[in-house]
Every structure is written in structure tokens, then in C-alpha cells.
Design a protein with these regions (language model features):
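Hydrophobic or amphipathic, alpha-helical segments that drive membrane association/targeting
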Residues: 1-8, 34-44
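Active-site recognition of the HExxH zinc-binding catalytic motif
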Residues: 74-86
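Post-HEXXH active-site segment of zinc metalloproteases
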Residues: 70, 86-117
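Short alpha-helical functional segments enriched in proximate histidine and acidic residues
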Residues: 26, 83, 87, 121, ...
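Short, aliphatic-rich beta-strand segments
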Residues: 2-5, 57-63
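Long, well-structured alpha-helical subdomains associated
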Residues: 115, 122-139
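Catalytic zinc-binding patch centered on the HExxH motif and its immediate surroundings
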Residues: 37-60, 69-70
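Zn2+-dependent metallopeptidase catalytic core
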Residues: 11-32
Length: 139
């Protein structure tokens, strides 16, 4: 696993790396490269996080720089669910259409099944991470 993080402080970089490593272990993902960019994502895109797939082993996660520690952990967990979906072939972008678990969808929204999975699991994994490692040292 290789993680490259840009656009934030050493303290946040350390937290981002720790959450990604935790999620890689929890999701049993191996031989994955993740590039993380922290920026004014919400101002520009009205989103706190994005995950895009370069191929089944290379991913870009974009994170908004204004997220507090709790939100940052939850958002990384959410985006890592998408990494798992892409890496396992559950989620495939076909031009502007999306193939999820062999069903073709015309578009994506927060109510899409792959987003529902990510929203449901982000809380479970974030709570487990916080219960294991705490967040006080990162705030």
C-alpha cells in the first residue's frame, strides 16, 4: 500500500494516513496506491469528499480542508468504501453511466445503492476507529 497526501498539515497528514491504513486493513485491500488531495473542495464542488478510480489499484481521494477531525475520519471511511467498491469491481464507471453489482445506473446521487452502502458503513468504521485510537490527539 502506498499513500501520498498533499495539501494539509503534518498533523492532519498523520491522521489521514492512519485512517486509510486502518480502512485498508478492515476492508482487506492490498497492493493499492492512494493519492490524497486536501483542498477547498466544498467551495468548488459542494462536496466534502470524492473518490475516483484511475484503475483497480490506483485511486484519488479528494477531501475538503475545512472538515473537523470527526468529519474527516467519517469522510475518509466513506471514500475508502468507494475504493473497495472500485477495487473489487463492484463499482465501474462506464462513461456517464455507472455499473454497480452488475446493474446499470444512468446517474449517481446520495440515494444510489453504492452511496447508501458508503453512508451506512462510514459511521460503523469511523466509530470503530475512534473507539480504537481516539481522536483527542488529532484535534
Amino acid at each position: 500500500m502506498l499513500v501520498d497526501i498533499q495539501g494539509t498539515s503534518k498533523k492532519k497528514t498523520s491522521l489521514i494516513r492512519k485512517v486509510i491504513e486502518y480502512m485498508m486493513n478492515e476492508l482487506k485491500l492490498k497492493n493499492i496506491f492512494i493519492d490524497v488531495e486536501v483542498s477547498n473542495l466544498f467551495v468548488n464542488e459542494k462536496a466534502y469528499g470524492f473518490c475516483s478510480c484511475q484503475n483497480k489499484t490506483e485511486f484519488l481521494i479528494e477531501l475538503d480542508q475545512t472538515l473537523n477531525v470527526q468529519e474527516l475520519i467519517e469522510t475518509i471511511c466513506h471514500e475508502m468504501i468507494h475504493v473497495k467498491q472500485y477495487a473489487t469491481g463492484e463499482l465501474v464507471e462506464k462513461g456517464k453511466k455507472i455499473l454497480y453489482k452488475n446493474c446499470l445506473y444512468e446517474s449517481s446521487s446520495d440515494s444510489s445503492p453504492w452511496e447508501k452502502e458508503a453512508y451506512e458503513k462510514e459511521i460503523i468504521f469511523a466509530d470503530k476507529f475512534i473507539n480504537t485510537f481516539g481522536i483527542m490527539q488529532h484535534s
